[in-house]
């Protein structure tokens, strides 16, 4: 889809299309998305944003984010002793959503730096590709990040309504070069990247299925661990390729891994791997990165292996385009 068409689609969204957006944060009261993206949101949009922090850090977060809170952003304290890691924090968010009867939510990391859309373009060599907007575009339209999330919500509701077996999704991680097909796809099911960092959750379906975050991923691997739980229970994941995000380099910004303690990091990655090896995903896990000695570092869903195992196929929904 060309730029003018996707911009028209984005401009036809409103704050009503936003999902409830939960952003867990720990030890970072001046978290990146709160410093750089949320101030560009409208007050009405901010009222659908929930920052989730531990009770002992609540006052500091409230002080650092008082301007956004005055404009409508919500700050939720997690009672002391309720969570002990990232996995239990994600579960707290899901429990909160269920308790408050929120049908669909986003669970987004606090270090997201850009929210962009893709459009049809060409490389310097003339090859067709999907280009993405950048920070310079925010100067022309500062509501781009909000509109991206509005369209995310609009598409997500469509997916969950038409495909109730889908419980989890996300938008795509920004790449330097994007396949030309991406800007033409509205959404795809059981294909594409593992849902991470900008997760979209069908809480109605998750409650009905009784799915919870596995305890094995409390300290590390919560994203892929939860996706594995969804899939092994017979449910599906989706992705929105025409929308993308970028984040702050985790090597310098992680609250879990310590760049100065490689042994601790190895232990965390091994915990993730050992947990995944106890699940069905062991049969369709692609080991994306390894330490120099070959130990597992990061993994993703191998959709080809998944479909071969289950005898299924992916599904792609394209944008409707008028024929000439």
Predicted regions and their residues:
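C-terminal catalytic/acceptor-binding lobe
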Residues: 1-6, 10-11, 17-19, 27-31, ...
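A structural signal for short, well-ordered beta-strand segments and their strand-loop junctions
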Residues: 104-108, 167-172, 237-241
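Short catalytic/ligand-binding loop motif for oxyanion handling, primarily in non-cytosolic enzymes
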Residues: 31, 59-60, 113-117, 177-180, ...
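Short hydrophobic alpha-helical runs that function as membrane-insertion/retention elements
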Residues: 49-53, 237-239
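Active-site-proximal specificity loops/subdomain of glycosyltransferases
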Residues: 53-106, 113-131
């Amino acid at each position: 889809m060309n730029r003018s068409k996707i911009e028209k689609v984005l401009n036809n969204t409103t704050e009503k299309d936003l999902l409830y957006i939960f952003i867990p944060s720990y030890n970072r009261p001046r978290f990146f998305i709160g410093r750089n993206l949320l101030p560009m949101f409208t007050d009405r949009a901010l009222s659908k944003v929930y920052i989730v922090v531990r009770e002992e850090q609540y006052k500091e977060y409230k002080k650092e984010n008082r301007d956004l809170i005055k404009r409508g952003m919500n700050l939720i304290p997690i009672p002391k002793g309720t969570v002990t890691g990232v996995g239990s924090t994600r579960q707290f968010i899901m429990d909160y959503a269920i308790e408050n009867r929120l049908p669909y939510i986003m669970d987004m990391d606090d270090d997201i730096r850009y929210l962009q859309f893709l459009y049809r373009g060409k490389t310097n060599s003339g090859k067709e590709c999907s280009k993405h907007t950048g920070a310079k575009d925010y100067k022309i339209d500062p509501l781009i990040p909000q509109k991206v999330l509005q369209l995310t919500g609009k598409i997500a509701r469509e997916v969950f309504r038409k495909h109730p077996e889908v419980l989890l999704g996300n938008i795509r991680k920004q790449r330097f070069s994007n396949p030309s097909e991406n800007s033409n796809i509205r959404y795809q099911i059981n294909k594409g990247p593992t849902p991470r960092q900008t997760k979209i959750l069908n809480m109605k379906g998750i409650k009905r299925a009784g799915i919870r975050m596995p305890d094995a991923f409390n300290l590390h691997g919560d994203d892929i661990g939860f996706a594995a739980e969804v899939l092994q229970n017979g449910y599906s994941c989706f992705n929105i390729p025409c929308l993308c995000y970028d984040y702050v380099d985790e090597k310098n910004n992680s609250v879990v891994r310590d760049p100065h303690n490689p042994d601790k990091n190895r232990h965390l990655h091994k915990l993730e791997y050992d947990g995944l090896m106890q699940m069905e995903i062991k049969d369709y896990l692609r080991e994306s990165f390894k330490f120099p000695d070959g130990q597992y570092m990061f993994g993703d869903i191998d959709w080809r292996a998944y479909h071969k195992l289950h005898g299924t196929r992916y599904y792609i929904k394209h944008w409707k385009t008028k024929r000439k």
